[in-house]
């Protein structure tokens, strides 16, 4: 058999092996509805399997047409990734004035994982404070004893205030602080500006108060260590931070 015929046979066999999988695709198109017949309202989240059940957490956006209007974090469950049961809000925004998650805040990219050590479900998310647009650039953390919540808000903040990243030379910080004073570096996208951004100019700017954290995810490695991966430095870079055991 020629090499071409062998290649053709391999491709055909591979395509045939995919047919059952394609036929069982979870989503057939159109509006994806939950068990109540409503459009699934769970944006920018994650799905993870716990004891044979899939849990889908996502942003619950209001239906009033207002952009970025957040109701909190919703939860849906499924056994087959096709039919989803709505469990409502597991982390609603707060009615308490001054709370970091007061109604009017922006909650995005919620990610939930199970901590084997503490036996807690831990939620991380991107948080913007009420009335500040996208200026806060914080992470938020909440925990629960069950995957259905309710999740209790723990805290929010910037990442790693006052902490140097691995491999960063402390003497570089003096020069980077100096660069922040140059008027010509106030203009974005110039070659000189790009060079200083790559060196960490915005990282140095946010050193004391902590690094910006916007779009994000959580990754658990095979050794059980968990990492927070997030866009930072005005969305110009990705940073990664190892989480503590809890």
Task: Name each model feature, range by range.
Residues 1-25:
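Bacterial Sec-dependent N-terminal signal peptides
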Residues 22-246:
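Carbohydrate-active catalytic/glycan-binding domains of CAZyme proteins
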């Amino acid at each position: 058999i020629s090499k071409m015929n062998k290649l053709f046979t391999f491709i055909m066999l591979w395509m045939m092996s995919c047919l059952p999988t394609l036929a069982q695709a979870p989503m057939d198109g159109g509006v994806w509805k939950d068990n109540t017949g409503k459009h699934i309202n769970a944006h920018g989240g994650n799905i993870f399997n716990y004891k044979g059940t899939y849990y889908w957490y996502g942003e619950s956006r209001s239906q009033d047409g207002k952009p970025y209007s957040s109701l909190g974090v919703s939860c849906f469950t499924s056994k087959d990734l096709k039919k989803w049961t709505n469990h409502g809000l597991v982390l609603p925004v707060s009615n308490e004035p001054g709370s970091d998650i007061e109604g009017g805040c922006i909650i995005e990219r919620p990610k939930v994982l199970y901590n084997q050590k503490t036996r807690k479900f831990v939620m991380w998310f991107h948080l913007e404070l009420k009335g500040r647009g996208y200026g806060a650039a914080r992470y938020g953390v909440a925990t629960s004893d069950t995957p259905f919540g309710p999740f209790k808000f723990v805290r929010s903040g910037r990442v790693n205030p006052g902490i140097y990243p691995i491999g960063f030379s402390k003497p570089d910080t003096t020069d980077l602080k100096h660069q922040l004073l140059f008027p010509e570096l106030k203009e974005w996208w110039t070659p000189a500006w790009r060079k200083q951004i790559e060196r960490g100019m915005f990282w140095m700017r946010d050193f004391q108060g902590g690094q910006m954290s916007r779009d994000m995810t959580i990754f658990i490695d095979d050794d059980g260590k968990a990492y927070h991966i997030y866009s930072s430095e005005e969305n110009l870079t990705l940073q990664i931070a190892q989480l503590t055991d809890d």
